[in-house]
Amino acid sequence: MKFGVIVFPGSNCDHDAFYAVTANLGQTAELIWHDSTSLGDVDAVILPGGFAYGDYLRCGAIAKFSPVMSAVRKFAGDGGLVLGICNGFQILVEAGLLPGALIRTRGLKFICRELRLRAATTDSPFTNAADPERVLRIPIAHGEGCYFADERTLDELEAEDRVAFRYIDNANGSLRDIAGVLNRERNVMGMMPHPERASDPLMGSADGLVVFQSMLQAGVRA
């Protein structure tokens, strides 16, 4: 399986994601610059964490206009797997590919720590290898990662089983403990925790590898 990792000016987790899917997952990957108009022959796309365009105006608000995002939208529309991690999640929300918003954390502080969470569904290409009973230890690192949506949207996410991950330790104040969500077609997911930073035992946890393993399983079945 070939992963495309999008690189925006200000991305700082692109090489982490690249390493996770190559060294830890054993797959191939390509770094794709923000001004590219094509994704090439990739099977899945990752929008990594960081501070795209300095997070000016609002996190992801400028990145959504990058030339590569037209290709990402088409890729997603054609059913391709798209994963947004942290800043990547914020970009997907700004681009209208995922519902809701990511706002300032509870306490208005940047939070960098390992949290406990669980997969809230296994019915997705990003969580099919997960055990919903297993507690995952995956770090967060954000100042604007509190998931917010109106009650109607939250109820829709619940009813349609589109909450991908929930915090056990809800440090940022996300509504209904939401750590990750899916689009209606279930081929796009955004999550604020960093699975690429928990994909190697040397990092203290390999729990995040389940996200990439799930994508691989979904790709093999497809």
State where each predicted segment sits.
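Short, flexible active-site-adjacent loop segments at beta-strand->alpha-helix junctions, enriched
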Residues: G88-F89, D123
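Active-site metal-binding loops of divalent metal-dependent hydrolases
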Residues: G50-F51, G88, G143, P195
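Amide-donor transfer/coupling interface in amidating biosynthetic enzymes
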Residues: R73-G77, T105-A222
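N-terminal beta1-alpha1 cap of cysteine-dependent amidohydrolase-like domains
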Residues: M1-I85, V93-I111, R118, L175, ...
